[in-house]
UniProtKB/Swiss-Prot annotation:
This is Clavatol biosynthesis cluster protein B. Residues 1-17 form the signal peptide. It comes from Penicillium crustosum (Blue mold fungus). Pathway: Secondary metabolite biosynthesis. It comes from the Eukaryota. Keywords: Glycoprotein, Signal. Disulfide bonds: none annotated. Glycans are attached at residues 103, 204. Part of the cla gene cluster that produces clavatol and ortho-quinone methide. The clavatol biosynthesis cluster cla and the terrestric acid cluster tra are both involved in the production of peniphenones and penilactones. The non-reducing PKS claF is responsible for the formation of clavatol from successive condensations of 3 malonyl-CoA units, presumably with a simple acetyl-CoA starter unit, and 2 methylation steps. The esterase claE probably collaborates with claF by catalyzing the hydrolysis of ACP-bound acyl intermediates to free the ACP from stalled intermediates.
Length: 214
């Protein structure tokens, strides 16, 4: 860590902020998003710093790659959580049997979501994959503060926030030269396609909610 004293303090702060997150055993959705946004902001500020150097840029880039690897599985969990709760019950039986959402069929407006999930099922992040069907992804009540949201609204918000964060991160990575690596370039292009699909789904959902509330 001593070498960081000769680098831009913004990059040093960004790296340390994310190192704290990686040292935690159990990290909530809110903490990951906040730390990701802070790290991106600090690294962008470093571009204007006189102490900014190639070593600073390389360290920031490596940190972004680690964040990317953490956010992609989070997006998968958010999509799966949202999709699972949109799918109507398959049976009125009291016995609950878990079904992988990627194998379900989606009616009408939810067909886009089904397509996203099927595309995502073959996507592999830089991190070890977890089973998304067993995880729930939504903001905590502490983050929402005075705003009261039902379960579907909070899951919608989680998707929206993750999409925005990932899109900003992918853009930064591409600007820093991530496109030179063919494997990363392919993953980024595919992820951007998924983000566009999810954003379209969210916009359609917002329009539907507005009509219902009017």
């Amino acid at each position: 860590m001593a070498a960081l004293s000769f680098q831009c303090l913004c990059v040093a702060s960004a790296v340390r902020a994310w190192e704290r997150i990686e040292s935690m055993v159990d990290v909530s959705f809110d903490v990951i998003i906040a730390a990701s946004a802070q790290t991106i902001q600090l690294s962008q500020q470093s571009q204007q710093c006189q102490l900014h150097s190639q070593s600073s840029a390389a360290e920031a880039y490596n940190t972004f790659i680690r964040i990317y690897g953490r956010l992609v599985p989070l997006l998968e969990r958010a999509i799966t959580t949202y999709a699972t709760n949109l799918q109507p019950p398959l049976s009125t039986s009291p016995t609950f049997q878990r079904t992988d959402p990627r194998n379900l069929t989606y009616p009408l407006d939810n067909q886009v979501l089904g397509s996203v999930l099927r595309d995502f099922s073959t996507h592999r992040s830089l991190q070890e994959q977890r089973n998304p069907a067993t995880m729930v992804c939504r903001p905590s009540k502490m983050t929402l503060g005075q705003y009261e949201m039902d379960e579907q609204q909070s899951q919608y918000l989680a998707l929206d926030v993750i999409c925005r964060t990932l899109r900003n991160l992918v853009i930064v990575l591409q600007e820093m030269g991530g496109g030179e690596n063919a494997e990363i370039r392919q993953v980024d292009a595919r992820l951007l396609t998924i983000l566009v699909q999810v954003r379209r789904l969210l916009e359609n959902t917002s329009a539907t909610l507005s009509i219902l509330e009017s």
